């Protein structure tokens, strides 16, 4: 019995392979049969680069067979027939080569490497159409020597913000609350000799922004932080400085002045014991009595319990 099932399965696979995968590829068109990435460097895996390709071949089950494409090709040309509709719904239409998307993929890959510090990266693409109605696209990448950070410094004009940005991780016990700031928040992501990676630079801005917002700078955002990169040494190294943009305050007369960023403090704290977000009745939210203790106002309504 198992032998018969195996034979049926082999016949089924042979039937799939024998089916034309270019049935719905028109004249002058090419099925995108395969995409290859060839790189001189070993820094990034092909799997890391594929998301930047604007066009991918049809899906391969277990990396062996484009069964969804074969199912689609089983359908007839009469789109109104129920069986053809079902086959096309279960299958996948052939991916037709689009040279515009190939060009865009080259640009995306080059932008990726530039953002990672490979400022002189070379990316090109070649298209092989020697097989009938099928195309193989090969992307060739030459990363060349990357730029690295030589010296990194912070030049934040506000002394309070500068001190917060340079905070060291506090010593906490193992039982410290999980909701408190983790030590990673205090560790700079930018290191000397590291790649001039723009994604890391952006994460560093966000790290400092998080530190500031947790300390009362609620109106602060990462756009107030910028960098100046000096590569004049011309040795694939960069001197990097972080700068702080001032807060621009508009006066009543319409003039704009640069000022320090504002740090907010908690003034009043009120606790409403009877508050129910599911109840819209205003009377239930109206306080019947107020108790002040340790600088906190406790308001409770007619259903609340006195805590005097």
Regions found by a protein language model. Give the residues of each.
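Interaction-mediating elements
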Residues: 20-308
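C-terminal motif of bacterial Sec signal peptides marking the signal peptidase cleavage site
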Residues: 15-18
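Bacterial N-terminal signal peptides that target proteins for export
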Residues: 1-7
């Amino acid at each position: 019995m198992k032998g018969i099932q195996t034979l049926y399965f082999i016949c089924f696979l042979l039937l799939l392979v024998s089916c034309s995968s270019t049935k719905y590829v028109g004249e002058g068109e090419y099925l995108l049969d395969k995409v290859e990435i060839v790189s001189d460097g070993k820094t990034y895996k092909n799997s890391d680069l594929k998301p930047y390709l604007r066009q991918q071949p049809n899906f391969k089950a277990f990396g062996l067979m484009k069964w969804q494409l074969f199912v689609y090709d089983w359908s007839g040309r009469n789109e109104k027939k129920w069986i053809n509709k079902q086959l096309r719904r279960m299958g996948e239409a052939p991916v037709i080569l689009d040279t515009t998307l190939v060009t865009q993929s080259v640009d995306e890959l080059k932008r990726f490497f530039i953002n990672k510090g490979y400022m002189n990266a070379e990316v090109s693409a070649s298209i092989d159409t020697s097989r009938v109605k099928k195309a193989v696209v090969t992307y060739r990448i030459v990363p060349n020597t990357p730029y690295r950070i030589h010296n990194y410094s912070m030049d934040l004009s506000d002394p309070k913000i500068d001190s917060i940005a340079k905070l060291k991780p506090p010593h906490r016990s193992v039982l410290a609350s999980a909701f408190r700031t983790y030590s990673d928040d205090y560790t700079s992501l930018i290191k000397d000799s590291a790649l001039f990676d723009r994604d890391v630079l952006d994460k560093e801005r966000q790290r400092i922004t998080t530190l500031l917002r947790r300390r009362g700078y609620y109106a602060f955002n990462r756009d107030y932080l910028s960098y100046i990169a000096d590569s004049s040494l011309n040795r694939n190294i960069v001197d990097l400085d972080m700068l702080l943009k001032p807060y621009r305050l508009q006066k009543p007369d319409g003039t704009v002045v640069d000022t320090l960023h504002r740090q907010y403090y908690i003034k009043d704290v009120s606790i409403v014991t009877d508050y129910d977000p599911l109840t819209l009745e205003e009377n239930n939210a109206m306080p019947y009595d107020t108790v002040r203790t340790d600088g906190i106002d406790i308001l409770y309504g007619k259903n609340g319990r006195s805590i005097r």
